[in-house]
UniProtKB/Swiss-Prot annotation:
It holds the Pfam family HGTP_anticodon. It is found in: Cytoplasm. It catalyses: tRNA(His) + L-histidine + ATP = L-histidyl-tRNA(His) + AMP + diphosphate + H(+). The lineage of its organism: Bacteria, Pseudomonadati, Pseudomonadota, Alphaproteobacteria, Rickettsiales. This is Histidine--tRNA ligase. Its main location: cytoplasm. GO terms for cellular component: cytoplasm. It comes from Neorickettsia sennetsu (strain ATCC VR-367 / Miyayama). Belongs to the class-II aminoacyl-tRNA synthetase family. NCBIfam families: hisS (TIGR00442).
Length: 413
């Protein structure tokens, strides 16, 4: 006996209601992208590893621990796409720089990270992604939050919104020094990961999931206290407009996001229906990515949402009313004609089925799940007729073949 081969750890097969939910999420996102004048973009699943090392930051968990990278047969360092923003920016530099800004790009598809599998988190997962590239005015940030909120509302998910600002580059450098001075006092209480972050990027300690570091992080300096007047004014303007639009949110001074390219506004949507891992959607502003890839420096903003986590907390979908026509032939001649009828009905857009190689009794048993059954006997066929049975009521009628299609359409309406 051959050894059973299961799916790869951290992946899963999608079917049934889970797949239906994914298709619904994708359709809602696409409809919103059309309303907000986005261009849909599909980037390759494989990219040069350097693209993500250069743009996500060497201190990010994605680059340090999670990226699936390998050398191809030509010796190039290639990776499976771990996130969308860097890939979308690469596509912008190659294909969209000549277009009037902001360039609005929408993507949906699979991503890959070598993470510890847990509820709502897989090594192959899917995201919906929106990017506004060349979005200078702060109102584009407001639009991003409004779109994100609309997206979650339309798929029936409750959410809470947290915002913060990372300010300009000068702000972040001053703030990093303040964090280093603060966390140095607690070095003996920091995890190995946080000690490494203390050397490379202390902001990432604020994103620590280690319960033993929670109280230390709570007492850390606040980045808004290090903002320039202009950066603080812009953040306050964004908050004022969100209040004007009756969008509830809270300012979270420890929110930093997990990737190093963010600057300015950052935001995260969480769900009260999830546990400790409650983030549903996140994003923020960035300005260095395009320049890092040989393009011009452009202020941009974007967000992404993990589909698997959304699927887990979406409301149960209403049952689909699949209206199916079953065909049950009786006799060898009827069997051949029933096959012709089966493919004819399908070509006319009806959902039709016929079980091959079964007895009449077994076929009728299978047909109980259908809306309508067409019973085709040899004697009836010789008269140019079939029996049509409505399965819910058991009502039967004899229908001439030339009227069969129109009768079935009426019964399936």
């Amino acid at each position: 006996m051959s050894i059973k081969i299961n799916n790869v750890k951290g992946t899963r097969d999608l079917f049934g209601e889970q797949l239906e939910k994914m298709r619904l999420i994708e359709q809602v996102a696409k409809n919103l992208s059309i309303r907000y004048l986005f261009t849909e973009l599909e980037t390759p699943i494989i990219e040069h590893t350097e693209l993500f090392i250069r743009n996500l930051g060497e201190t990010s968990d994605v680059v340090n621990k999670e990226i699936y990278s390998f050398q191809d047969k030509s010796g190039h360092n290639i990776c499976l796409r771990p996130e969308f923003t860097a890939a979308v920016t690469r596509a912008f530099v190659e294909n969209f720089q000549h277009i009037q800004s902001p360039v609005r790009l929408f993507s949906f598809g699979p991503l890959f990270r070598y993470e510890r599998p847990q509820k709502g988190r897989y090594r192959q997962f899917h995201q919906v992604n929106f990017e506004w590239i060349g979005a200078k005015h702060y109102l584009w940030a407001v639009e991003a939050i409004v779109l994100a909120k609309s997206f979650l509302k339309e798929i029936g998910i409750r959410c809470e919104i947290r915002v913060n600002s990372l300010g300009c580059s000068r702000t972040r450098e001053e703030y990093k020094l303040a964090l280093i001075n603060y966390f140095q006092q607690y070095k003996e209480h920091l995890s190995a990961d946080s000690l490494l972050r203390l050397k490379k990027n202390p902001l990432r300690i604020l994103d620590s999931k280690d319960p033993s570091e929670k109280e230390i992080v709570v007492g850390a300096p606040r980045i808004l206290d290090y903002h320039t007047d202009d950066a603080l004014k812009e953040f306050e303007s964004i908050c004022d407009i969100l209040k004007l639009l009756d969008i509830e949110f809270s300012v979270d001074h420890r929110l930093v996001r997990g990737l190093d390219y963010y600057s300015g506004l950052i935001f995260e949507f969480t769900s009260p229906d999830l546990g400790a891992q409650d983030a549903l959607l996140g994003g923020g502003a960035y300005e260095q990515l395009s320049e890092n890839l040989g393009g011009k420096k452009v202020q941009s903003i974007g967000f992404a949402a993990g589909i698997e986590r959304l699927i887990d907390i979406m409301p149960v979908l209403a049952p689909t009313s699949d209206k199916i026509v079953s065909i049950v032939p009786i006799g060898e001649i009827a069997e051949r004609e029933a096959l012709k009828l089966l493919f004819y009905l399908r070509s006319e857009g009806l959902c039709a089925d016929m079980c091959y190689g079964l007895s009449v009794k077994s076929r009728m048993k299978r047909a109980e799940r259908s809306t309508v059954t067409v019973i085709l006997g040899e004697e009836e066929f010789s008269r140019g007729e079939s029996t049509v049975r409505i399965m819910e009521t058991g009502q039967q009628m004899t229908v001439a073949h030339e009227k069969l299609l129109s009768t079935l359409r009426e019964l399936l309406c």
